[in-house]
Amino acid sequence: MPKHFALVPAAGSGSRFGAEVPKQYLEAAGKPLIFHALAALCRCPQIAEVWVVLSAGDAWWAEVDVLSLGGKLRPVFCGGATRAESVANGLAALSAHLA
């Protein structure tokens, strides 16, 4: 059976949004927004791994309760200057992992 992967670009700084923290780390229902998105993907039985593309200097990721999401998460700190670059970098990291 083929493996399916999710790739979540989360390297943005949210500078246009104007908040003190990147918008993926803003809280909703007591948890960062990114937690809710990742939890939904981790619950999906068809997805083998959830790759999260983060910026190299991401200071907020360590605060996310990722252990409660199980072992599917694969954070990679290779975000680019744009979302497209982050996705390309994440796909390259995933491709290298699978090679």
Show the residue positions of the predicted features.
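N-terminal glycine-rich phosphate-binding loop and ensuing alpha1 helix
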Residues: 3-59
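Conserved N-terminal catalytic core of the sugar/cofactor nucleotidyltransferase
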Residues: 35-99
